[in-house]
A protein has these predicted regions:
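Generic long, charged, amphipathic alpha-helical segments
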Residues: 418-484
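Short loop/turn segments that connect beta-strands within beta-propeller blades
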Residues: 93-96, 141-144, 204-207, 291-293, ...
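Bacterial N-terminal signal peptides
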Residues: 11-24
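Surface-exposed loop and turn segments in beta-propeller and other repeat-based domains
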Residues: 104-111, 152-157, 210-222, 296-333, ...
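Repeat-blade elements of multi-bladed beta-propeller folds
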Residues: 31-39, 66-90, 111-137, 158-200, ...
Length: 528
């Protein structure tokens, strides 16, 4: 038998102890360079702020903006970058709160009134963000705010928008396109002639040239918008992961249906799935795309044929349905979008073995965990009630120990957490709900979650001016550790870097919340 020297054995033992310690150690603090902190879209970072001192958070400084701030800030090299609903983009010194530069988006040649609600992505000397009008993607010099290039990602749909925050990997920017045609009558769109199709787009980071573009629905269909958080980009798998929204409308059916001219709703009552659902209608789905070409690797549609049949329709839905306006489909669906891209989550099982899942929360209230290579469902959990303004919307977070989700429940449907919004933590291995707490304001919760060093940060849509709409929760128990009342609703996610929490306030889009204080906050322990 070959002998191993005692010194080698001791060295291996020491190495194993060190590796075990590193595996269980908190994430090291680093920059937060895009919506979800990085291309895993996990919204997780290290921080010196913990559950033992977060109760002493106080305002460090504020910036008066030109509008509500619902985009999560990117913070890189001691500069915070964020847009506001007044059409401005800001760069702020994180040490002092002094504005380094700010520009109107219209200064770059875009129409007056153009706004961005995307979190900037920062790489090197550039920041990247999308627009709420015209579906433009911009590259801007980080130091002075000068325009480098801008590219229109969709030219066929006059209502096209970019609300997906960009992700940058290597020399490519990845983002999604949605459409305000879903607002139909509210925005003057005629869905009978609309060409609104969601897409995922890859753009050269240096030049702005479109490298590939993949539509989520076929020609003749509308919808499939890609509209929340930032895409997951996994170079090890050469894969981009996104979530999609519902159809706004279906065409009258020709091929492959045997009944040309039959409406979609009639077809599903009388025909088969193969004849009624286009295999390329990737709505309410999680998609895996090839990073290099945009080719579809797999798609998982999470509204099933049986659900569609039970609805006597499809998941055709638009904003007209909220107000009983004329372009709402006769049999509207439930509007079960994936309002954000997935999270790529790596966790350790009880034996210490690492596993990676693609997790995504849907407006149905279900959070799904999928195999990243095949799309197979590993587990699914009903975390709260679903509706057109329910379930999970703008983004979840994970530290690898738990997945943190916000439940909107705007309509006050009964649930285990009561008849309002809530926040919950799920086990990444099983989907079991580990804790769930109600919004203390009795409000809806659609803001993206953040987590850092055992503390979860959550925003409330409460319209009560005295309500604490910024909250910090214990990641292990969900117990409230800190709160702050900015006087308005909060739909921005918190950004946590080192010893500071950066947070925008105000949200009045579609009348869902309140705004008007025009303030961006930095918090630190003791305000120091």
């Amino acid at each position: 038998m070959k002998k191993i020297s005692r010194s080698v054995s001791v060295s291996m033992l020491v190495l194993s102890v060190v590796l075990a310690a590193l595996a269980s150690a908190p994430l090291m603090a680093q920059d937060w360079s895009m919506f979800g902190a990085d291309t895993t879209n996990a919204s997780n970072n290290g921080s010196s702020i913990s559950n033992s001192n977060v109760s002493r958070l106080a305002v460090k400084w504020t910036v008066t903006t030109g509008g509500d701030v619902s985009a999560r800030a990117a913070v890189v090299a001691n500069v915070a970058y964020f847009p506001d609903w007044g059409g401005n983009i800001w760069a702020v010194d994180t040490k002092t709160g002094q504005v380094i530069w700010s520009h109107k988006l219209s200064d770059y040649g875009l129409p007056a009134g153009t706004v961005s609600r995307t979190s900037p992505a920062v790489q090197g000397d550039k920041i990247y963000l999308g627009t709420q009008k015209g579906a433009w993607l911009l590259a801007i010099k980080a130091n002075k705010g000068d325009l480098v290039w801008m590219t229109q990602l969709e030219t066929q749909d006059p209502y096209a928008i970019v609300t997906t925050s960009p992700a940058v990997q290597g020399n490519v920017v990845y983002t999604g396109v949605a459409s305000q045609a879903e607002g139909a009558s509210l925005f003057g769109a005629d869905l009978s002639t609309a060409v609104a199709r969601g897409s995922v787009v890859a753009v050269s980071a240096n030049k702005g040239a479109i490298q590939w573009k993949t539509y989520t629905v076929p020609t003749g269909y509308t919808g499939g918008g890609v509209w929340g958080s930032n895409p997951v980009v996994d170079p090890s798998r050469n894969t981009v992961y996104v979530g999609t929204g519902d159809n706004y409308s279906h065409p009258q059916l020709g091929a492959p249906s045997s009944k040309p001219g039959v409406t979609f709703q009639d077809c599903i009552l009388k025909d088969t799935e193969a004849n009624c659902l286009s295999p390329d209608d990737h709505v309410d789905s999680i998609l895996a795309l090839d990073m290099s070409s945009g080719a579809l690797k797999w798609s998982r549609r999470m509204v099933t044929w049986n659900q569609i049949y039970a609805m006597n329709g499809s998941d055709d839905w638009n904003v007209d349905c909220l107000y009983g306006l004329s372009q709402c489909p006769s049999n509207p669906g439930p509007d079960y979008d994936f309002g954000s891209a997935p999270n790529e989550i790596t966790y350790k099982d009880s034996r210490g073995k690492s596993h990676t899942i693609i997790g995504a929360g849907q407006k149905s209230g279900i959070y799904y965990a999928l195999d990243p290579d095949t799309g197979a469902t590993l587990w699914q959990t009903q975390a709260g009630p679903g509706s057109s303004l329910g379930g999970m919307e703008w983004g979840s977070a994970s530290d690898g120990q738990r997945i943190y989700v916000a439940i909107a429940n705007y309509y006050g449907l009964p649930s285990a957490a009561g008849s309002a919004g809530s926040w919950a933590a799920l086990d990444p291995a099983t989907g079991a709900i580990l804790w769930q707490v109600a919004d203390p304001n009795g409000a809806s919760d659609i803001a993206p979650m953040s987590v850092a060093n055992g503390v979860v940060y959550a925003g409330s849509l409460s319209q009560n001016a005295t309500a604490p709409t910024m909250l910090a929760l214990d990641a292990t128990t969900g117990h409230a550790l800190w709160n702050f009342a900015p006087g308005v609703s909060v739909n921005a996610g918190a950004t946590i870097v080192n010893d500071t929490v950066y947070w925008g306030s105000g949200y009045s889009n579609l009348g869902l919340g309140t705004g008007g204080n025009h303030t961006f906050y930095a918090f630190s322990v003791g305000g120091n």
